[in-house]
Amino acid sequence: MLASHFKLSSVLSPRTDEEKQYMSHVPYENAVGNLMYAMVSTRPDISHAVGVVSRFMTNPGKEHWQAVKWVLRYLRATSDRCIVFNGNSSEGSVCGYVDADYAGDLDKRRSTTGYVFTLAGGAISWMSKLKKQLHCPLLKPNI
């Protein structure tokens, strides 16, 4: 859901005292916390974006803040959208979807995987998770 032009990494974090001073007045943590609440409560569609922007909570830069504001604008523009359970739907079974961003974490080259399960057209379970470590079976030592 985060626009493809946002290539966020720790390289974009403030380096100078002036940049750090500017970002100290930005309510980044508060905004990301509000996004987390919306994600958990009613908006599973922003799970990936929230996971990405939350990686920079300790030292966010201006580009990170721009991404948070983009997600907030997305929520405002789609505030009429909601999870609907259609009782008349022919979709009486659970349906699942999965996706991954394959090394989308530009700092540590880790992937994010997510899934969503729906019933009668409405999301009933969802998750988005950053992998803890890189797994590459080709790099295992021969024993």
Regions found by a protein language model. Name each.
Residues 1-143:
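Divalent metal-binding acidic/histidine catalytic loops
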